[in-house]
Regions:
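Proline-enriched interdomain boundary motifs that mark the N-terminal boundary
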Residues: 1-9
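Solvent-exposed loop segments of extracellular immunoglobulin-like
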Residues: 27-37
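A short beta-strand segment in extracellular, disulfide-stabilized domains
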Residues: 16-27
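Short, solvent-exposed loop/turn segments at the edges of extracellular beta-sandwich modules
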Residues: 74-80
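Conserved positions within compact, well-structured domain cores
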Residues: 94-312
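C-terminal edge beta-strand
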Residues: 83-93
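Surface-exposed, flexible coil segments in extracellular/virion-facing regions
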Residues: 39-58
Length: 312
């Protein structure tokens, strides 16, 4: 047989998520038919130990952990050796929270928790809206692992996040990918958060020492801390903002990196040079720093905000 077996399988998923996969990539010189077998030693993929067929659909376990599945291909005639391929998935669950209220996004039925800081209501979860349909796809889940966005949210380019519109002023950001009545935070919105969390006014371009520790959450991934340990940032989450180290994408969703190392979130205010900012938390420092990049290459997380009076 020639070729390599390949099948789509998520790197990360949530407990109880339904997974569907289709295998391809192998041919025989004689063109003889192939048969496929799916096997897992640690997941219940069917009533039997083995699933026969080119596709598979099953539900991931209810317990967090790392699980694997192997698919085998062989020629029905028996004239060629078999080929196999194995993939693993990290199944995740978390109950990290921080709630003033709940908001239902009418576009897709997703429910978000929010909390009031200063003059604004802030989502305490990352946005996970994927667009109205396949033709208007917005953002991507980390490593293209659909389902993980239920915990981590999606990563968006600045243009996807904001609709390409810069914002300014308190509560003056563009709706972008956020629900109606909510917006992508401006520089002034972020400064208002810093004042509410830290108790003193901070310029947007400052490093925001100490704030990163107060807004990053000690999330666990299958029983282990997701943020690597550092005495310089204990991720106390004392302000219940629930910052997770969800990483970023590069090359317009072409590569993914920095999960469990960085958490990053957009601001909607473009500078005079056409560059756009995101704030970030690094596991090894207690700051909530800022960096500027272009509008398309990087993908980071989004928090949505609204003036708190709008929710009354």
């Amino acid at each position: 047989m020639s070729g390599t077996l390949s099948f789509d399988f998520p790197s990360y998923a949530v407990v109880g998520q339904k997974v569907e996969s289709y295998v391809s990539g192998i041919t025989t010189p004689s063109g003889s038919d192939l048969e496929y077998f799916w096997v897992s030693s640690d997941m219940d993929i069917s009533d039997n130990d083995t699933v026969i067929g080119q596709s598979i659909s099953f539900t991931l376990p209810a317990d967090p952990g790392e699980y694997s599945i192997t698919v085998y291909a062989r020629s029905i005639s028996g004239e060629y050796y078999s080929s196999s391929s194995t993939a693993s998935v990290q199944v995740i669950s978390t109950d990290a929270d921080g709630v003033t209220g709940r908001y239902t996004d009418v576009r897709d039925g997703e429910i978000y928790h929010y909390r009031t800081y200063g003059s604004l209501d802030w989502f305490t979860q990352n946005l996970r809206y994927s667009g109205a349909d396949a033709d208007t796809l917005l953002g991507r889940p980390y490593d293209d692992s659909e389902g993980i966005d239920q915990i981590f949210g999606r990563l968006y380019s600045w243009s996807d996040a904001t609709g390409g519109v810069s914002g300014s002023g308190l509560g003056g950001g563009p709706q972008g990918a956020c629900p109606e009545g909510w917006s992508v935070p401006t520089v002034e919105d972020w400064e208002d958060l810093a004042l509410a969390v830290g108790g003193s006014a901070l310029d947007f371009l400052d490093h925001w020492a100490g704030i990163g520790e107060m807004v990053s959450a000690p999330i666990t991934l299958n029983g282990s801390a997701m943020w690597p340990y550092s005495p310089d940032n204990l991720h106390t989450n004392t302000r219940d903002w629930n910052g997770f180290p969800t990483g970023n994408s590069r090359d317009h969703y072409g590569e993914y990196e920095n999960i469990a190392v960085y958490g990053m979130w957009w601001a909607s205010t473009e500078n005079a040079d056409g560059m756009v900012p995101y704030r970030f938390i690094f596991y090894n420092t207690d700051t909530f720093d800022v960096y500027y990049t272009d509008k398309e290459s990087y993908g980071v997380s989004v928090r949505c905000v609204r003036l708190s009076s709008q929710g009354q």
